[in-house]
Regions:
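ABC ATPase nucleotide-binding domains
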Residues: 178-223
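Conserved ABC ATPase "signature" region
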Residues: 59-77
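Conserved catalytic motifs of ABC-family nucleotide-binding domains
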Residues: 102
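Conserved ABC transporter NBD signature motif
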Residues: 3-14, 23
Length: 223
């Protein structure tokens, strides 16, 4: 897709024909359906595939594959066929393949949308740990509020344009306006709204669940 106007910069580089190869090497992508990304006969082979294409020396490649699988908790499955894994395990392998390439940026395109709630939360936590350990930029394209809550910055897209740029707290404080953006209202924001209607006083429209728990205890102690 070509830009209509202006310039695009990624990690300080302007995107053009001369820089596109270097920029591609800076980015790893994990898609919604991991089955569409698997090419190796085993988990280990699949994680190594991109490294082989780049001509990474064998010893370094083996070390990277081992480290990436350890990071996502899939070392014990190195010799398994990807097709025999669960949905959550497949996504972990796909993320390991991206991490092994040592990108500066990882793009997650609805990467947790096909998982059950437990698998989704586990994968989100894994991504957070990887981000913190490697200081990577993670761009997550998602409708999942748990993912949004862990982000530093949220860009809301509406009809192909940036509707807003804010912190998760600022976004969630918009209450029922979120529904018009195709998003759900967080549980804590819903509960605060209900409690306000019943006469309880809150200074915020949104709190994290831990903050809400603390404030509810304060309200109960005052009652």
């Amino acid at each position: 897709m070509q830009k209509e106007k202006g310039n695009i910069y990624i990690d300080g580089l302007e995107l053009n024909r001369d820089t596109i190869y270097n920029i591609r090497n800076k980015i790893g992508v994990v898609f919604q359906n991991p089955d569409n990304q698997f090419v190796g006969a085993t988990v280990e082979d699949d994680v190594a595939f991109g490294l082989e294409n780049k001509g990474i020396p064998l010893e370094e490649m083996q070390a990277r594959v081992k480290e990436a699988l350890e990071l996502v908790g899939m070392s014990a499955f190195a010799d398994r066929e990807p097709a025999r894994l669960s949905g959550g395990q497949k996504q972990r392998v796909a993320i390991a393949g991206a991490i092994a390439m040592r990108p500066n940026i990882i793009i997650l395109d609805e990467a947790t949308s096909m998982l059950d709630p437990e698998g989704r939360l586990e994968l989100i936590q894994t991504i957070k740990e990887i981000r913190d350990q490697y200081n990577m930029t993670v761009v997550s394209i998602t409708h999942d509020l748990d993912e949004v809550a862990l982000s530093d910055r949220v860009l809301v897209m509406k009809k192909g344009k940036v509707e807003s740029s804010s912190t998760p707290r600022e976004l969630f404080a918009r209450g029922e306006e979120l529904l018009t953006l195709g998003l759900d209202i967080p549980f804590s924001a819903n509960l605060i709204s209900t409690l306000k209607d019943k006469g309880f006083e809150f200074t915020e429209n949104y709190l994290t669940e831990k903050e809400l728990e603390d404030q509810l205890w304060e309200l109960l102690l005052k009652a």
